[in-house]
Each structure stands twice: as structure tokens, then as C-alpha cells.
């Protein structure tokens, strides 16, 4: 799949902007704080209905305006698709081919993206919440049913925690009713995550071995808060552990076990990557991002769109070469933001170049030397 055009109205620092893209490589060039990342963020938002930079939709609306819109034309193997998101103080509306979508799980997945931004370098050492979000975003695009299961799980979890906080004496029978619902959806979420991480780990290791010239092995471990050895055991083990922690949950007023406590651990040559060098971290994340692209292609049969937000400056020459080589090999539509063409000499000469300046974007005819 590839996005053919994007239209913005009152988005960030863009009052009105439109751009038509090529199915290959598209480069946004401009000084800092001109709107390059905003444009890339809009593509990301159109796909996953969230920003990688802010939690508030209000931050996305142009100064003194009450609403904004992002729309785009997508070319998929199954045909052309029109996507649109409207944001206002009343909430948001998502549309596919002009039809409103009632649920996120009906919308997300229509356009798949993989984002590589500087903040991704915090994935290994950052909070577990970052790693859960990483799984949620990828799985939500690959398997719409995952978002439905996760949404139901979070709803029941909220109910269970609210009950624990509101009572002075525990009603184990009532809590068991909530447990049944929590385990039903939570075991599905964990099963999805387990299968995803197992597949992702294989792809990531392939890319990491290529980047390290065969000197390093990358592995990823899914650390579920529920102890189990096989996927078939998840439901029963989750139920057993919930029952044994009723008193603990009552005293602490929250639910101590479940996918909301899950984590990922990365290893390089069987050593926890928390202790890896900065260069190894960069290679790990680069491997992970290219693995996301490969896995989405394998599992859906269609290409995701790759978004590279100001990451060339974060990589040394060797890793830049590896990244650009992988981009060519994967043959996916790619967007790059940069302040300079210095690192792009290895790219095809027929790239689409866009100059971004003070909230305007225009096609440039400059070719790479």
C-alpha cells in the first residue's frame, strides 16, 4: 500500500496544505521547527489515530481554530481507499470512503505504518508502558480483533479497580464475576502478544545479524505477568493467579496481574540490552523497525508505509548505509524528514523531494547528486 496524497486543514502549523507523493521515496527537507515532523505526524495519525508526540488532540489544532482535519488517498492491493479524521472540541470522527467508523478496530489497519523516530531509542531502557504501547500499535494494525479484545479488557479492568477502591469488605463472588470477564479478554490479549513477539524476534534477529555482520544475536522475551509455559495454559493460569491475589488486590486497591503489567526484554548475545552500548541500542532499534516492516508484509500480504522522522542524524555512517539499503530492499513507500541532503547520496536519483517552510510544503525538482 502507499499513500497517494495528503490534505491538512488547521493541523498544527498548517492552515491548509496538500501534497501528492510517489510510491517510492519521499523526502521532506527544511530547517527545524518549520513543520516537517508535523507533516509526518499527520500521516501517522491518519493511520493509528494517535500522535507519537502528544496525548492531547487539542495540541494538533491550529492556533485559534476549533477543529482540524486530516484526509488522504490510499492505494491498496484491494483498491483505492479514502481516509479522513476530523478533530474538534466535541471529539473525533474517523471515516473510510466517507463512511463513519463506529469503533477504532473498524478503522485502524486500513493504512499500516511503521514509525522510526528519535524517541524510539528509549524503547529498551524506558518504562514498560512504552513497550506495551509498541506492541499495541503494531498488533492493532495487523489484527483488528486485537484492539477489540484490548478495549474490552481495559474496560473490565477499570470496573474491577473501581470496585476494589470503593468497598470496605470484599465480595469474592462479585469479584469472581469480574475475574471471568477479565480473564476472557486478557488471555486473548496475551495470546496475541506472545505470537507477535515470537514472530517479531525471528525477523529482528535476521536484520540485526545483517547489521552486525553476524557478530551479534538479538532475542526478545515476552515477559507476561501471568506465569505460563504454553499458550493453551494462559486462560487457566491467569484465572488461578487472579484468585490467589484477591486479598492483595483488595489491600492495594488495584489489579496486580494481567496484560496491563506485561513487558518486553531485549537481549544481545544473551546479555540484557539494558547494559548494551549506545551504538548497540541504535542497531537494536533499527533491526526492530525493519522487522516490523517485514512482519507486517508477511502477516497481511500488503506493504506498510515507513516513516523515518529525523533519525538519520541519530545514526552513524554504517547504520545509515544499512538502513537505506534495507529501505531499498523492502521496496515500501518511505518518508524521510531531514535538515540536509548530506546523508542521502545513496538514494535513488528520482526521489520526490519536498521543501517545508513555515507551515507550507511544496514539491522541489532538485535531484540528488
UniProtKB/Swiss-Prot annotation:
Q: Name one Pfam family in it.
A: SMC_N
One GO cellular component assignment for this chain's record is: cytoplasm
Q: Which GO terms describe its biological process?
A: DNA replication; DNA synthesis involved in DNA repair; double-strand break repair; SOS response
Spell out the PROSITE patterns in the cross-references. Answer: RECF_1, RECF_2
Keywords assigned: ATP-binding, Cytoplasm, DNA damage, DNA repair, DNA replication, DNA-binding, Nucleotide-binding, SOS response
Xref: Gene3D superfamilies: P-loop containing nucleotide triphosphate hydrolases, RecF/RecN/SMC, N-terminal domain
Per the record, the domain of life is Bacteria
Residues annotated as binding ATP are: 30-37
InterPro entries, alphabetically? DNA-binding_RecF, DNA-binding_RecF_CS, P-loop_NTPase, RecF/RecN/SMC_N, RecF_2
* Molecular function via GO: ATP binding; single-stranded DNA binding
Q: Where in the cell is it found?
A: Cytoplasm
Q: Which family does it belong to?
A: Belongs to the RecF family.
What function does this protein fulfil? The RecF protein is involved in DNA metabolism; it is required for DNA replication and normal SOS inducibility. RecF binds preferentially to single-stranded, linear DNA. It also seems to bind ATP.
Among PANTHER family, the record links this protein to: DNA REPLICATION AND REPAIR PROTEIN RECF
The protein depicted here goes by the name DNA replication and repair protein RecF
Query: Which organism encodes this protein?
Result: Streptococcus equi subsp. equi (strain 4047)
Q: Which gene encodes it?
A: recF
Amino acid at each position: 500500500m502507499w499513500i497517494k496524497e495528503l490534505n491538512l486543514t488547521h493541523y498544527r502549523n498548517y492552515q491548509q496544505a496538500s501534497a501528492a507523493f510517489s510510491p517510492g521515496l519521499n523526502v521532506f527537507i527544511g530547517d527545524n521547527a518549520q513543520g516537517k515532523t508535523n507533516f509526518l505526524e499527520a500521516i501517522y495519525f491518519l493511520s493509528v489515530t494517535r500522535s507519537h508526540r502528544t496525548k492531547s488532540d487539542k495540541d494538533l489544532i491550529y492556533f485559534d481554530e476549533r477543529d482540524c482535519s486530516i484526509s488522504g488517498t490510499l492505494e491498496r492491493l484491494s483498491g483505492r481507499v479514502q481516509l479522513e479524521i476530523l478533530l474538534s472540541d466535541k471529539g473525533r470522527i474517523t471515516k473510510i470512503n466517507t463512511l463513519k467508523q463506529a469503533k477504532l478496530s473498524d478503522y485502524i489497519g486500513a493504512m499500516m505504518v511503521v514509525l522510526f523516530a528519535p524517541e524510539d531509542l528509549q524503547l529498551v531502557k524506558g518504562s514498560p508502558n512504552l513497550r506495551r504501547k509498541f506492541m499495541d500499535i503494531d498488533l492493532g494494525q495487523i489484527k483488528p480483533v486485537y484492539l477489540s479484545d484490548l478495549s474490552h479488557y481495559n474496560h473490565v479492568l477499570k470496573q474491577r479497580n473501581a470496585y476494589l477502591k470503593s468497598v470496605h469488605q470484599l465480595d469474592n463472588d462479585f469479584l469472581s464475576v469480574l475475574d471471568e470477564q477479565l480473564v476472557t479478554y486478557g488471555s486473548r490479549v496475551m495470546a496475541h502478544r506472545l505470537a507477535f513477539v515470537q514472530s517479531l524476534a525471528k525477523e529482528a534477529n535476521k536484520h540485526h545479524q545483517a547489521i552486525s555482520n553476524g557478530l551479534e544475536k538479538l532475542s526478545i522475551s515476552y515477559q507476561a505477568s501471568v506465569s505460563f509455559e504454553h499458550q493453551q495454559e494462559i486462560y487457566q493460569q491467569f484465572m488461578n493467579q487472579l484468585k490467589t491475589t484477591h486479598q492483595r488486590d483488595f489491600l492495594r486497591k488495584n489489579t496486580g496481574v494481567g496484560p496491563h503489567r506485561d513487558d518486553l526484554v531485549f537481549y544481545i548475545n544473551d546479555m540484557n540490552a539494558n547494559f548494551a552500548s549506545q551504538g548497540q541500542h541504535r542497531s537494536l532499534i533499527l533491526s526492530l523497525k525493519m522487522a516490523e516492516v517485514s512482519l507486517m508484509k508477511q502477516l497481511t500480504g500488503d506493504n506498510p508505509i515507513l516513516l523515518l522522522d529525523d533519525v538519520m542524524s541519530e545514526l552513524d555512517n554504517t547504520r545509515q548505509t544499512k538502513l537505506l539499503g534495507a529501505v531499498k530492499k523492502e521496496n515500501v513507500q518511505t518518508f524521510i524528514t531531514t535538515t540536509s541532503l548530506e546523508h542521502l547520496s545513496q538514494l535513488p536519483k528520482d526521489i520526490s523531494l519536498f521543501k517545508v517552510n513555515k507551515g507550507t510544503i511544496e514539491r522541489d525538482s532538485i535531484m540528488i547528486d
